[in-house]
Regions:
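Conserved positions within compact, well-structured domain cores
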Residues: 2-189
């Protein structure tokens, strides 16, 4: 999944003062799609699946970090990404981080959303109460050894583990008609 809301630019603020990035991690423009990272991983890769997921041992029930239930792996009680597993913090510095579920809920609740096309790729223009905005491109997601859904849907990770199954984490998912927070399998990029 693309990582967007990384608090890079001091231009976009929602109601409680969270500052959002104006571009995806790994790019210097709002239009390219950015890089794809599995949840909690800090490197891009060529294949995305349980067999290549670094926070587990090859299956959804052998997680080695961020696990709340023993049926999914080694329980550690960690619910949100630590700074050593937050690609935004590692890349941009300690004041930067992947948004939490709460941050994304605020984006959904306090901002206006409008479908927009940039360089042939649709996405959503998200405008805050101060009139400033970010563009979330429909960048698709990586699974197996390919990226699918470019121009069809977008998925943007939060830093928050999904309560109903430690093999998932929350992400903002959207298509041309809906946008919502959902739990999704952690190995997707």
């Amino acid at each position: 999944l693309s990582l967007h809301a990384l608090f890079r630019s001091r231009q976009f603020r929602t109601s409680i003062g969270v500052l959002w990035a104006t571009e995806n991690l790994g790019i210097s423009s709002v239009y390219p799609l950015g890089k794809y990272f599995a949840w909690g991983e800090t490197e891009c890769k060529t294949s995305y699946g349980w067999d290549s997921y670094t926070l587990g041992k090859g299956t959804y029930n052998t997680l080695t970090k961020y696990c709340l239930d023993s049926k999914y792996g080694i329980v550690d009680g960690l619910f949100g990404l630590a700074s050593e597993d937050d690609i935004a913090t590692l890349t941009l510095g300690k004041e930067w981080h992947i948004p939490s579920k709460k941050n994304m809920e605020e984006l959904l609740s306090y901002c206006s959303w409008k479908v927009e096309v940039q360089e042939g790729i649709y996405g959503w223009r998200v405008t805050g109460p101060n009139g400033k905005s970010i563009y979330l491109a429909a960048a698709g997601s990586a699974s197996g050894n390919r990226v699918a859904g470019i121009g069809e849907f977008g998925r943007y990770w939060t830093s928050t583990l999904y309560e109903e199954g430690s093999y998932s984490a929350y992400n903002l998912r959207f298509n041309q008609s809906t946008y919502k927070l959902v739990g999704d399998t952690r190995f997707y990029g």
